[in-house]
């Protein structure tokens, strides 16, 4: 079992926690991590690109010249693709880029990135993050006590609204609930701060 220190909000050690090696100490699978990141990034695309084909371009209802006798190539509309200002052939249309990978593959990717953070010493476990009211300065003070000063992902309980609101104005800090933890955000974070109860919930869902 991998052991990590459980810190208080003031930075002192409260206890020691044994992590489940099946979740936090596996051999990372880089191929599956890549698949999961690409899936999430593809799902984030708006896919609103569009151009007009010949039926969508305005004008061109009149035949530009008669069919025969002019020596020119026949044409039925000045909005045909070969004309300047004409429609586009096989251009991009709005579509969704979202796709899914297997649930087990995604879970393996999540366990892989969590294991990487533990191996690199970038996981910080806190016994609790409690604030009397939403206040950014209080949240910054806690991060300073935990020696966290880089791009950070903080994972808290579902009902910890004060912590979520306190971090909204911090540019390098992202706070999410346990159910929202995902591969892309864990990969992008330099530090991972997780509340102890969330660690137990993550292990219960992935072990």
UniProtKB/Swiss-Prot annotation:
The keyword RNA-binding applies. One of its GO terms (molecular function) is structural constituent of ribosome. The keyword Protein biosynthesis does not apply. InterPro entries: Ribosomal_uL4, Ribosomal_uL4-like, Ribosomal_uL4_dom_sf. Residues 48-75 are annotated as: Disordered. One of its GO terms (biological process) is translation. This is Large ribosomal subunit protein uL4.
């Amino acid at each position: 079992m991998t052991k990590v220190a459980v810190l208080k909000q003031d930075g002192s050690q409260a206890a020691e926690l044994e992590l489940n090696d099946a979740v936090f100490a596996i051999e990372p699978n880089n191929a599956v991590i890549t698949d999961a990141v690409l899936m999430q990034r593809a799902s984030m695309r708006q896919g609103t690109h569009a151009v007009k084909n010949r039926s969508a371009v305005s004008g061109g209802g009149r035949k530009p010249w008669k069919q025969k006798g002019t020596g020119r190539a026949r044409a039925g509309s000045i909005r045909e693709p070969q004309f300047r200002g004409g429609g586009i052939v096989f251009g991009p249309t709005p579509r969704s880029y979202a796709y899914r990978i297997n649930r087990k593959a995604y879970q393996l990717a999540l366990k892989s990135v969590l294991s990487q953070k533990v191996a690199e010493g970038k996981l910080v476990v806190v016994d609790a993050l409690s604030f009397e009211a939403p206040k950014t300065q209080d949240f910054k003070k806690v991060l300073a006590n935990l020696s966290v000063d880089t791009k950070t992902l903080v994972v808290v309980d579902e009902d910890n609204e004060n912590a979520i609101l306190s971090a909204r104005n911090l540019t390098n800090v992202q706070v999410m609930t346990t159910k929202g933890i995902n591969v892309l955000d864990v990969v992008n974070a330099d530090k991972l701060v997780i509340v102890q109860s969330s660690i137990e919930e993550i292990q219960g869902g992935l072990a």
